[in-house]
Amino acid sequence: MKNVGFIGWRGMVGSVLMQRMVEERDFDAIRPVFFSTSQFGQAAPTFGDTSTGTLQDAFDLDALKALDIIVTCQGGDYTNEIYPKLRESGWQGYWIDAASTLRMKDDAIIILDPVNQDVITDGLNNGVKTFVGGNCTVSLMLMSLGGLFAHNLVDWVSVATYQAASGGGARHMRELLTQMGQLYGHVADELATPSSAILDIERKVTALTRSGELPVDNFGVPLAGSLIPWIDKQLDNGQSREEWKGQAETNKILNTASVIPVDGLCVRVGALRCHSQAFTIKLKKEVSIPTVEELLAAHNPWAKVVPNDRDITMRELTPAAVTGTLTTPVGRLRKLNMGPEFLSAFTVGDQLLWGAAEPLRRMLRQLA
């Protein structure tokens, strides 16, 4: 059995990872060691059937060097501090990371095994020891649209995202819900009075939204009842860093011989933990919609094709329907007026599952 260290297992992504590992009985195949950046020495958690003693110090290089595999959901600052020191010390173990820090390094592979198992296998055969989870929207796009990429049908992709609060973190989710609650509380009496005028209610809500009284420590501006058409840092070319990741990570995941252009706008909306994306896809040749649907549905067990039907779409292609599931549905598939090679698609996926924790879990399963 491999000795596997876990850092950041208490956080949001880490908690989802622990839950999935228990569900799949992954702990049966490893010797887990739990680390903490602040509470080492206290009792370690029990997942599965094995007691794991006490929490170890996440900054203790000697303790970390004793591990065969490290799985970290602790964030980029931790990776920046510990990873170089570990490698410089001669540690030859496997590093599995949820943070973006190492994604684009030449000696790292972005992991999404239903999409790039061939790349992962080649990396393992060539001694690669660093495996990093991808950007959530990129991973979810490839899970849903993987059939088109696998058959080399994609000329380019334009995307508009509808990204959930969870992409920012736990505090962002709390802030969104708090904003929602304050807006409701501000007009609760009027809403309970059928004779009240809805435009008066709207004016009160708008006034509170603009007043500066809503909590915005995390998002910077109100999200409830609104949206934020910018995610992550601003780059010199006018993109946000989130938008830059689309092309950079897609092509690295797929190990493409020539770059597939991917670009668009990334937008934060008031969903809790499911990212949605609207795509305009330029195909390399004309492909019928039934064939597109067959290719998408056959690519992996989680890519579910939703018929382009109003009622079915409203039931099945929403964050409310998909949250907490591993399904990555794709729908609104139709040809666009621009020409027979132009395809529309709409996808939804849980940002914390295939968007974050599940690729890490499955990579660990391969190594253990």
Swiss-Prot record:
Q: How does it assemble?
A: Homodimer.
The record describes the protein's role as: Catalyzes the NADPH-dependent formation of L-aspartate-semialdehyde (L-ASA) by the reductive dephosphorylation of L-aspartyl-4-phosphate.
Q: Identify the residues that bind NADP(+).
A: R10, G11, M12, V13, T37, S38, Q74, S166, G167, P194, Q351
InterPro entries from the xrefs? Asp-semialdehyde_DH_CS, Asp_ADH_gamma-type, Asp_semialdehyde_DH, NAD(P)-bd_dom_sf, Semialdehyde_DH_NAD-bd, Semialdhyde_DH_dimer_dom
Write down the species: Salmonella typhimurium (strain LT2 / SGSC1412 / ATCC 700720)
Cited SMART domains: Semialdhyde_dh
What name has this protein been given in UniProt?
Aspartate-semialdehyde dehydrogenase
Reaction catalysed by this enzyme: L-aspartate 4-semialdehyde + phosphate + NADP(+) = 4-phospho-L-aspartate + NADPH + H(+)
Instruction: List, in alphabetical order, the Gene Ontology terms for molecular function in this entry.
Output: aspartate-semialdehyde dehydrogenase activity; NAD binding; NADP binding; protein dimerization activity
